[in-house]
């Protein structure tokens, strides 16, 4: 599987927990493993506006989008468009987008489902990629935090089903129960690989896979043991998650969400992708 990456995503936010090192070190590990890399272009404004409100996009361009988690970095709109472009390219080539900033907490107008911050997110990368493809899609969110932005964007969309496995109670405080086409599976902290994998089997059993042409994975690694939303997952756990996703035999792509140890991210991504061809 090809990895989508640009060093431009390392240019900002070195002081922040959602900083470049979490991606830089992962890139180094995956390069050593022999993965092929592709450079993304910017998502077009048309691509962005399929998902996000025009006034929100204007404020993001003007540097007016900021909260306690999510700084108004200089040129952040361009960095966010590049991450969204990475997701689009990954969707096209059935690859993995190793880009930042992440996206699954960003709703149509930024804040989503009553949450007061955007959780390091500016544009919803996976939503932009799914809308770009325009095909029936299962979005599988394995980040340790609930993808409140993704749920808000696709709630009621008959062509998309969102499935989220996440720690609860935990930020953003949403995702306790399912609603319509958004199926949520809250898990206790540090539940471990075995409980997680059983829950993933349960989640997939509730989905009519024949409805979907695409599986889009919000690939967060902060569920790794000791990370911000630890569910006690290990490298072996991510390997088994990858096997389950590969067994679905769909057009599959991955978009990086959280995960704040670059070392763990690189190893977990490699394990996740081992069931897919290099």
Segments predicted by a language model, with ranges:
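A short, acidic, flexible beta-alpha connecting loop/helix-capping segment that sits on the rim
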Residues: 9, 223, 258-262
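Metal-dependent C-N hydrolase catalytic cores
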Residues: 1-130, 134, 186, 204, ...
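Short, electropositive alpha-helical surface patch
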Residues: 54, 234-235, 264-278
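Short, hydrophobic-biased amphipathic alpha-helical segments
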Residues: 22, 83, 241, 265-273
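Metal-dependent catalytic neighborhoods of phosphoester/phosphodiester hydrolases
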Residues: 227-229, 262-267
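Conserved alpha-helical scaffold segments that buttress catalytic/binding sites
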Residues: 88, 99-249, 273-275
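Short acidic/histidine-rich active-site segments
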Residues: 251-258
